[in-house]
Swiss-Prot record:
The lineage of its organism: Bacteria, Pseudomonadati, Pseudomonadota, Gammaproteobacteria, Enterobacterales. This is tRNA 2-selenouridine synthase. Keywords: Selenium, Transferase. Gene3D superfamilies: Rhodanese-like domain (3.40.250.10). PROSITE patterns: RHODANESE_3. SUPFAM superfamilies: P-loop containing nucleoside triphosphate hydrolases, Rhodanese/Cell cycle control phosphatase. It catalyses: 5-methylaminomethyl-2-thiouridine(34) in tRNA + selenophosphate + (2E)-geranyl diphosphate + H2O + H(+) = 5-methylaminomethyl-2-selenouridine(34) in tRNA + (2E)-thiogeraniol + phosphate + diphosphate; 5-methylaminomethyl-2-thiouridine(34) in tRNA + (2E)-geranyl diphosphate = 5-methylaminomethyl-S-(2E)-geranyl-thiouridine(34) in tRNA + diphosphate; 5-methylaminomethyl-S-(2E)-geranyl-thiouridine(34) in tRNA + selenophosphate + H(+) = 5-methylaminomethyl-2-(Se-phospho)selenouridine(34) in tRNA + (2E)-thiogeraniol; 5-methylaminomethyl-2-(Se-phospho)selenouridine(34) in tRNA + H2O = 5-methylaminomethyl-2-selenouridine(34) in tRNA + phosphate. One of its GO terms (biological process) is tRNA wobble uridine modification. The gene is selU. Monomer. Belongs to the SelU family.
Length: 377
């Protein structure tokens, strides 16, 4: 419970809310939340999907007062008490948060009033999700126009690790929950496009707030295509990336294979096992993941080459399950890199020949970036 002297005001400062990453108690219906939400948002709806649809139909046919009356009849008694209790607990757990609905209107106001009747004063976001969303898109467009450098290199070069290690790095693949290749999906589902964009804006705002400690800051991003799995990059960011200088990481095949072995065969198998609990189910899901990654590019490989690699993959999977040994995967992964992924990336890199600013191994690129782009004051 907050006393009047401690009451926090409602906020219309969407930029500050996104930058700070405050918790939002989002009272929109689940279907709205699934289409797009802000980082830190918790969906505790005033109305479920069916209730919202019924109230919306009533509003169109009979007007606002009739729709409001229907809403109160639908969210009544035990249903109302259960939702109030969920909001109360969320307010206690997140005392610095805000209520949020679609436009900062009736739904967040009703929840705020109901909470106030229980002695809980909790502020709302004026303008709601719509204002936050617009601020997020504007921020991404604005910040995307700042200087940047891309990290390029063949699969397994350690590009993502470099991005994550640098103070101005934005991990686009991490935000998208996808690593960009046919084997790129993770166990975390990809976000809706709007949610991906909102998380990207929040990451850029949060990182940019720390740029004052750097003498010559640039964004550091992995050299991506326009799509990362099902998510596409915002247009302005994509346009700037197409013109940005590129630092190319050149690592020997053996080192790349070791990175990929750890990430795709050791860590992914453990992740499937942890997620599913049952050992047999974990192995089936992990096997399906590897099978699908290779199957997705079968036409580009050619069916004969695909069949050859698939047989090697199956043998490596059987060996891994039997002995725990993962190096057998190199029998299909090495030719896949050398015959498919590497030529494809080199072809793309040739188009950017004039943009290449530096070449070196992982540690050389790291040192070059830190010296030229991320030097501390």
């Amino acid at each position: 419970m907050q006393k009047d002297a401690q009451r926090r005001p409602d906020s219309d400062d969407a930029l500050a809310l996104i930058t700070r990453g405050v918790t939002l108690i989002d009272v929109r219906a689940p279907v709205e939340f699934a289409q797009g939400a802000m980082p830190g948002a918790i969906n505790l709806p005033l109305m479920n999907n069916d209730e919202r649809a019924a109230v919306g139909t009533c509003y169109k046919q009979h007007g606002q007062q009739a729709a409001l009356a229907l809403g109160h009849r639908l969210v009544y008694g035990e249903v109302r008490e259960a939702r109030l209790n969920a909001w109360r607990l969320a307010c206690e757990r997140h005392p610095e948060g805000f209520l949020c609905c679609a436009r900062g209107g009736m739904r967040s106001y009703i929840v705020q009033q109901w909470l106030r009747e229980r002695g809980i004063d909790y502020p709302l976001v004026e303008g709601g999700y719509k204002r936050l969303r617009q601020e997020a898109m504007d921020a991404t467009d604005r910040l995307s126009r700042l200087p940047m450098v891309l990290i390029g290199g063949c699969t397994g070069s350690g590009k993502t690790q470099l991005v994550k290690a640098l103070p101005t790095g934005i991990d686009l693949e991490g935000l998208a929950h996808h690593r960009g290749s046919s084997f790129g999906r993770t166990l975390t589902p990809q976000r809706a496009q709007a949610s991906f964009e909102n998380h990207l804006a929040a990451a850029m705002l949060n990182h940019h707030a720390r740029w004052t400690t750097l003498s010559n800051p640039f964004w550091v991003l992995e050299d991506e295509g326009k799509m990362i799995g099902a998510n596409h990059l915002p247009a302005v960011l994509r346009e700037q990336m197409l013109q940005a200088p590129v630092a190319v990481v050149e690592e020997p095949l053996e080192r790349r294979l070791e990175r990929l072995r750890e990430e795709y065969f050791v860590q992914m198998q453990a992740a499937f096992q942890a997620a599913l609990g049952d050992e047999a189910a974990g192995w089936r899901a992990y096997g399906d993941y590897l099978h699908h990654g290779l199957y997705a590019i079968r036409r580009r490989l050619g069916l004969a080459r695909y069949a050859e690699l698939a047989a090697l993959q199956e043998a490596a999977l059987a060996r891994q399950q039997r002995t725990g040994e993962t190096h057998a995967h190199f029998a299909w992964l090495a030719p896949l890199l050398e015959g498919y992924y590497d030529p494809m990336y080199r072809y793309q890199l040739e188009k950017k020949a004039q943009q290449i600013a530096f070449r070196g191994d992982y540690h050389q690129v790291d040192a070059w970036l830190r010296h030229r782009y991320c030097a501390s004051r």
